[in-house]
Amino acid sequence: MSLAEFDADVVVDARDCIMGRVASNVAERALAGDRVAVVNAEQAVITGTEDDVFSTYRTRANLGSDRGPYYPKRPDGIFKRAIRGMLPYKQDDGREALDSVRVYVGNPMDEDGDVLDGTSLDRLSTIRFVTLSEVSEELGANVTW
C-alpha cells in the first residue's frame, strides 16, 4: 500500500516528543479503530543517558541469529517496533491495529501532525535524552533523512 492509498484519521507529530508516550497513545488509538500516521519519527526522543540508550539498542541489534529476532535500525522501524510492543500483535485485533499504523521519517502528509497531550519533551525534568536519528546512526543505518 503506497502513501497515496493510506488515508489517516489521525496524524501525530513525534517531533520533540517522548517515543514511548507517543507509541502508547498511538497503540491505544489503533486498537480503538483509528488509522494513525506518525510523522517526523527521526526527531522523537528516548530518555536516558546517551551511553545507556546506545548500549540497549546496540545489544538488541547484535542479538539474534539468522532466524531472529530482528531489530530495526531506521528510526521509523524502531518507532513501529515500539508500537508493536504495546499491541497484542499475535491476535487478530492487534494485527489489524498494527496494520492501521504508519510511521514516516519526515512529513510526507499534506497536513501538519498533532502533538499529543503529555508526550512533549517539556515535561522532562532532565536534559538527558537521545533522538531516534542519533540511535539509528549509532546502529549503522543509512542516513537518508
UniProtKB/Swiss-Prot annotation:
One annotated GO molecular function: mRNA binding
Keywords (A to Z) from UniProt: Ribonucleoprotein, Ribosomal protein
GO biological process assignments: negative regulation of translation; translation
Record-linked PROSITE patterns: RIBOSOMAL_L13
Pfam families named among the record's database cross-references: Ribosomal_L13
GO cellular component: cytosolic large ribosomal subunit; ribosome
Domain of life: Archaea
The keyword Protease appears for this protein: no
Record InterPro entries: Ribosomal_uL13, Ribosomal_uL13_bac-type, Ribosomal_uL13_CS, Ribosomal_uL13_euk/arc, Ribosomal_uL13_sf
Matching NCBIfam families: L13_A_E, PRK06394.1
Binding partners and assembly: Part of the 50S ribosomal subunit.
PANTHER family cross-referenced by the UniProt entry: LARGE RIBOSOMAL SUBUNIT PROTEIN UL13, RIBOSOMAL PROTEIN L13
Function: This protein is one of the early assembly proteins of the 50S ribosomal subunit, although it is not seen to bind rRNA by itself. It is important during the early stages of 50S assembly.
Family: Belongs to the universal ribosomal protein uL13 family.
Record's protein name: Large ribosomal subunit protein uL13
